[in-house]
């Protein structure tokens, strides 16, 4: 494929043969997520016979990038040990992305139907795929949708998943309480027998009980769980604790581009997390100092805000913060910078003979000089 691409042309291909195949399609394991909701068909309908050539969803990319393919996802359910096939689903991906990211436009592939608007370019787009922490978008088209196509709408998956988890946790807690009560009853019987024997020997058991009770209270306060409680919360209200943050916010991508491998793997347990957090605006600053917009997106409301603020160039925290932006796209460069910083740090420790306050723990003031860095943060939920 030429690097510059060319304008779309359908002159060398028959509509009937766009993606038709005889097999059941590829496996659905580890398929990248589509930006859009899927399409299902009426029973007996063939997607490749009905799909218009310019059947590209609206809402993402420029005019040159309105090109891609619909990918078939086969589905089934096991019922009493037997496989029961479910209706196929078709998901849209832009050219150069998704499960067939390396395929050329109009390349004959199993379970793939190519589509493009007339003024698009036949070169790979840079639009990527949807992150795991983002909701899929409702399908909208400039062309007429075939009556046999059913456009799926977003389901409240988080709510149903939360209810399922809540029921499971409730059962587990009930079983745990039952076992605990049984064990406690046995322990109480043994304890009462021991206390009675000690009392006969003249031992002050009440004093020992008070001491043991205080010890238990201190122990329970030390082992209190500080892990953030994220159950039944929207994705945008969850808080990452110590550990991998991708399970809450997805892998690093163009829509979630902050954090190197160390920060993503350790969350707020990362070495420089406190200093990085100091560079982030407060809730009230975001709420009252941002530009907000909202629009309907299927059965949900999509909210976008843009927030601009300044950081001083000569503050060490600013340099650390900037290094985390788009770090996922340059892993080798980031690793080299980290090694250099570590070497410089060891060199300074050997040379210096006195303890110097750590500049990275200084607090910001509201007044900065003219040597500043401007950061514009746009978040869409």
Curated annotation (Swiss-Prot):
It comes from the Viruses. The modification Phosphoserine is found at residues 9, 253, 255. Residues 223-336 form the CoV N CTD domain. Residues 17-26 have a biased composition (Basic residues). GO terms for molecular function: RNA binding. Keywords: ADP-ribosylation, Host Golgi apparatus, Phosphoprotein, Ribonucleoprotein, RNA-binding, Transcription, Transcription regulation, Viral nucleoprotein, Virion. ADP-ribosylated. The ADP-ribosylation is retained in the virion during infection. Signal peptide: none annotated. Residues 201-234, 333-353 have a biased composition (Basic and acidic residues). Residues 33-159 are annotated as: RNA-binding. Residues 154-183 have a biased composition (Low complexity). Residues 31-153 form the CoV N NTD domain. Residues 1-29, 152-239, 331-353 are annotated as: Disordered. One of its GO terms (cellular component) is host cell endoplasmic reticulum-Golgi intermediate compartment. HAMAP family: ALPHA_CORONA_NCAP (MF_04095). Homooligomer. Both monomeric and oligomeric forms interact with RNA. Interacts with protein M. Interacts with NSP3; this interaction serves to tether the genome to the newly translated replicase-transcriptase complex at a very early stage of infection. Packages the positive strand viral genome RNA into a helical ribonucleocapsid (RNP) and plays a fundamental role during virion assembly through its interactions with the viral genome and membrane protein M. Plays an important role in enhancing the efficiency of subgenomic viral RNA transcription as well as viral replication. Belongs to the alphacoronavirus nucleocapsid protein family. This is Nucleoprotein. The lineage of its organism: Viruses, Riboviria, Orthornavirae, Pisuviricota, Pisoniviricetes. The gene is N.
